Amino acid sequence: YWYGFNPRQKDFLAEADSGFLVMACVDLQFAFAVPYEVLEPIIPYLNVTENDEGITHWHLQINPPENGEYQFVIPKKGEKLSLKKYEIQLPQIQPVKIAV
């Protein structure tokens, strides 16, 4: 899974007393709610896309389960962060039947 995290989003979360970046995955019944205090120190170690004005976004990559746990990739440190404790269950939604 891949997400783009832009400077405006970073600034918004930084201003919150308790900010969370929530990342959902279309095919999973849970999402990841990562506290900004966990995310902030690893931002300098993420890959970026830049233009003449600076960073347009940081690349957030989640790898498929390793030992049953999804992992957040921190490429410039060669590390991974387990996302297990940041999983939040999503409600199961039943498909809606539409009369034609």
Kindly give the residue locations of the regions a language model identified.
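Catalytic cores of nucleic-acid endonucleases
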Residues: 1-31
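Non-catalytic C-terminal interaction segments of nucleic acid-processing enzymes
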Residues: 28, 32-100
